[in-house]
């Protein structure tokens, strides 16, 4: 038997709390990296408890394997390789590969539409 769906206000509070935890993790990383890693673990627990996604802004800022907060230039390396963004975790060596075909496609479409609009005028 299912437990039922959580109210929308609970989910909104959980998302707001996850944003706060990730912002604190970013602020605390310089002085206390272990504390920022703890904030990431707490945010992940919130997302599993309330069955919500971690906000897109923060989804690329932690390692999916070791759950450490990634700060480019300190414990993460970001590279652009073959139409994808490679984020290398400096803690465990895990590589996250994120394609960016959609961005290129939208850019091409916008360029095509602007040329089409110019020709119509």
Swiss-Prot record:
Give the GO cellular component terms, alphabetically.
Answer: cytoplasm; ribonuclease P complex
Give the principal location in a single coarse category. Answer: cytoplasm
User: Where does the UniProt annotation locate this protein?
Assistant: Cytoplasm
Gene it is expressed from: rnp4
- Which family would the database say this protein is a member of? Belongs to the eukaryotic/archaeal RNase P protein component 4 family.
Report the HAMAP family cross-referenced here: RNase_P_4 (MF_00757)
Q: Which cofactor does it need?
A: Zn(2+)
Q: How is the cofactor bound?
A: Binds 1 zinc ion per subunit.
Q: What is this protein called?
A: Ribonuclease P protein component 4
Q: What does this protein do?
A: Part of ribonuclease P, a protein complex that generates mature tRNA molecules by cleaving their 5'-ends.
Read off the InterPro entries from this record. RNP4 (IPR016432), Rpr2/Snm1/Rpp21 (IPR007175)
Q: Which GO terms describe its biological process?
A: tRNA 5'-leader removal
- Per UniProt, Zn(2+) binds at 63, 66, 89, 92
**Enzyme class, one word?**
hydrolase
The record's section on PANTHER family has: RIBONUCLEASE P PROTEIN SUBUNIT P21 (PTHR14742:SF0), RIBONUCLEASE P SUBUNIT P21 (PTHR14742)
- One Pfam family, please name it: Rpr2
Q: Which UniProt keywords apply?
A: Cytoplasm, Endonuclease, Hydrolase, Metal-binding, Nuclease, tRNA processing, Zinc
Reactions catalysed, semicolon-separated, are: Endonucleolytic cleavage of RNA, removing 5'-extranucleotides from tRNA precursor
The species this protein belongs to is Methanobrevibacter smithii (strain ATCC 35061 / DSM 861 / OCM 144 / PS)
Q: Which GO terms describe its molecular function?
A: ribonuclease P activity; zinc ion binding
EC number(s) in its UniProt entry? 3.1.26.5
Q: How does it assemble?
A: Consists of a catalytic RNA component and at least 4-5 protein subunits.
